Amino acid sequence: MLTFTPITLEHHALLRKYYAGCDYHLCEYSAGTKLMWSLYLRPSFAEEAGCLIVRNRIDGEWVFDYPVPGPDGDVDAALTAIESYCTDTETPLVISVVPEEKAPELLLRWPRLRMNNERNWKDYLYRAEDMAAFAGRKYSGQRNHINKFRKEYPTAKFVPLTGADMPLIENFWADYEQEFQKTSFNAKRELAYAKALARLLPEGWLLGGGLLVDDRLVAMSLAENCGGTLIIHVEKALYSHQGAYPTLVQAFAAHFGGDCVYINREDDAGDRGLRTSKLQYLPVRLAGKLRFEVQCEADRLREIPTVTTPRLTLTPLEERDEAAYNALCLDDARNRWWGYDYRQDLKGELTEDYFL
């Protein structure tokens, strides 16, 4: 049976081993997301059939990511291992953040299921070359904002950020918080998580970059290359420096997006302002994240039916049937006719209400 280990900072190398080549294009399939949002996702992992299997605990419910194969990984075998684990532990089988292109094989695998694909959690995918150039009339708005920024701050320059720049980054957070006006719990939580992720920059696997004006950062991004998709985990700019956001987006894409097809700027979480902003950059695709809740024939029943035959009537068990049902389970003389022996499946101590 699968054995899960909670994901901690020390597992970043193991996660990158799988996510570095993962072509799912979704932000959840990255080391940065698992670590940045670990307090919310409560992720744990197992390795099986050459695949990474991640289990998350969200709102009191276990949900599994779609398996991520290594070079010789067998996704079908990994899915079978998840099925067996859920059967053995009596855990409802829920596969979440499934890439849309993987849906057909799961629909064939599980004919009875409940599926949804919420708009709020779809990731915004952009072509890396579009973000690096902002060419053509359709990007005239972004170019105008960048030109105004360059005119207002002629000495501004883009710089890669490494672990050696942590003092610079800490000063940026202090400046950013002075201008931060959002009061919602989600906004404050996201900022705290972003600051925590930035502290991992010295580990060497995150890609960092920012805009420098007079030796102070006015904007910064943190990202991760996963299978040719540049996943932007953090993207912040000082509100007082108008045009800093599009300037950062373009410069970051030009510097880090050369070997990438897509740039993933993650979801908008239903925030209207964020949605408007992300749409203005003209995504080529809103990448869906499907949720599969696997069911069986019994799940379709609204109530347990009563079945009547000439010899007997089958009805739902009631409290008054407890003693008779318990006696039946322990009746070796009868159970031997259909090969049932409770001792083979007994787990723990045999109590009076064990079978109920």
Feature roles, as predicted:
Residues 102-117, 144, 269-286:
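Conserved active-site alpha-helix within GNAT-family acetyltransferase domains
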Residues 111-182:
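Acyltransferase donor/substrate-recognition loop-hinge adjacent to the catalytic core
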Residues 17, 28-101, 212-241:
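Conserved donor-binding loop and adjoining core beta-sheet/short helix segment
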Residues 116-124, 284-300:
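Conserved catalytic-core motifs of GNAT/GCN5-like acyltransferases
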Residues 164, 168-216:
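Short, conserved active-site entrance elements at the starts or edges of catalytic domains
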Residues 27-44, 186-204, 344-356:
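Active-site rim helix/loop that mediates acceptor-substrate recognition in acyltransferases
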Residues 205-293:
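Aromatic (often tryptophan-rich) hydrophobic motifs at membrane interfaces
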Residues 163-177, 297-356:
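GNAT-family acyltransferases
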